[in-house]
Amino acid sequence: MAVTGWLESLRAAEKTALLQDGRRKVHYLFPNGKEMAEEYDEKTNELLVRKWRVKSALGALGQWQIEVGEPALPGAGSLGPELITESNANPIFVRKDTKMSFQWRIRNLPYPKDVYNVFVDQKERCVVVRTTNKKYYKKFSIPDLERYQLPLDESLLSFAHANSTLIISYQKPKEVLVAESELQKELKKVKTAHSSDGDCKTQ
């Protein structure tokens, strides 16, 4: 089963864990050289950040690509392309999951709720957002469902609008909830260093 396949690849990855600033940071190194880093709230186990990095054909490390969480703020760490700020007036697309849902926030969208049309495009396996006034259009996939090879179900999709922010939620299928619970059990086995311990060692 595909869900098991992704879970097994997470189990097989080399993992290091670090507790810092109320966050449990987990780094995964997969056999193919791909890296994934996740940050969880230490108290709630809620996923705050997930990002990926792959090596180029020449073996150089690429930039981290953020899948979940806020992009790094200017001045935080070394300067890089990911620190170029967007205009405050442009719509800003950020994924922030909850325990029970995948969730996306699109800021700087001032139009009333009835202007938005949010639906699943089954052919392209993505979620589409469009406005009846043709001011905004976006489509995005849900990588988690791709990894678990689960279908998109429009009945699990909902959206709300408040404070110029469109909030799109996709209820996590039970297969994903079970897999995430299994992963948390797995992560408890990883020796966790504390930020005062220096570099954490790979398990």
Swiss-Prot record:
One of its GO terms (cellular component) is extracellular region. Pfam families: DPCD (PF14913). It comes from the Eukaryota. One of its GO terms (biological process) is epithelial cilium movement involved in extracellular fluid movement. May play a role in the formation or function of ciliated cells. Belongs to the DPCD family. This is Protein DPCD. It comes from Bos taurus.
